[in-house]
A protein has these predicted regions:
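A general structural motif
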Residues: 64-66, 86-88, 104-115, 134-141
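His/Asp/Glu-enriched, well-ordered alpha-helical/loop segment
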Residues: 123-131, 135-215
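Generic structural signal for hydrophobic
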Residues: 9-10, 77, 98, 118, ...
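Short, small/polar residue-rich loop motifs at catalytic or cofactor-binding pockets
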Residues: 218-220
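Glycine-enriched alpha-helix->loop->beta-strand junction motifs that scaffold or abut catalytic
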Residues: 12-15, 97-105, 120-126, 150-154
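Metal-coordinating catalytic core of metallo-dependent amide/deamination hydrolases
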Residues: 1-91, 130, 159
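Oxyanion-binding "anion nests"
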Residues: 80, 93-99, 110-136
Length: 233
């Protein structure tokens, strides 16, 4: 079980982040069962009967274990000394619960309502770089560019396309008319949200982690990499 798995780790393991994910059908990212049906049946080739069985079994597991697993994950994050993140919050109520748990940043809030509530609670909003580049969510949720337009986006995640991160930061710089602010979504903002106080900006006494980037049309090409002040690439 999740509780047993978490129990294998301790503060000495250096766990930095615990993310509270719940992919139960019918809520959060998968609140629209028709979209979930198309996704699951298309990816796994399930029949309608198999899909309905999948939904019912996942919902039954959530009913039986969801609350205790969530409580255990929050408690273990505190024991580890890890930063807590929420995941796919959809409603103001879910964000409020995340805030009470002590979440410092929200991974991929799925609605404007959730992002606005994050702002009210002082929770950093993180969205996926692929979402920004493609102009929308592959799951039909809120678009990163729309949250950026409403000043509700703080951090970019590479998500499932690591190479998208730099290009997306430059795109945000263009959208906001502020390149340093765009770059901050992949440097200082995530460093602050995750408690990495020794990095994220160029300042005396901090790590000298630097990349030199050339802009080619809408893409970013890395031309040099320094870690701790030493060139490694």
């Amino acid at each position: 079980t999740l509780i047993a798995e978490l129990g294998k780790f301790g503060p000495e393991d250096g766990i930095g982040i615990v993310s509270l994910m719940d992919h139960t059908p019918g809520q959060r990212q998968f609140r629209n069962l028709d979209q979930l049906r198309n996704y699951v049946r298309g990816k796994h080739g399930l029949s309608e009967e198999e899909f309905l069985h999948h939904v019912a079994s996942q919902q039954a597991l959530s009913d039986r274990l969801g609350a205790q697993h969530e409580a255990a994950a929050v408690a273990e994050a505190r024991r580890f000394g890890a930063v807590l993140a929420s995941h796919d919050d959809t409603t103001a109520g879910q964000v409020a619960t995340s805030a009470r748990h002590g979440a410092t940043f929200a991974e991929f809030p799925t609605t404007v309502e959730a992002a606005q509530e994050c702002r009210a609670w002082g929770i950093y909003v993180m969205m996926g770089a692929p979402n920004l580049i493609r102009g929308g969510s592959h799951s039909g949720n809120v678009a990163a560019k729309d949250l950026a337009q409403m000043d509700l986006l703080d951090i970019l995640s590479s998500d499932y396309v690591p190479s998208a991160l730099l290009s997306a930061a430059l795109m945000l710089g263009d959208q906001w008319g502020d390149l340093p602010r765009g770059v901050a979504t992949v440097t200082s903002a995530p460093a602050k949200a995750t408690g990495l106080v020794d990095r994220g900006q160029l300042a005396l006494g901090l790590r000298a982690d630097v990349i030199r980037v050339a802009r080619l049309a809408q893409a970013a090409a890395v031309r040099g990499v320094w870690v701790g002040g030493r060139r490694v690439g």
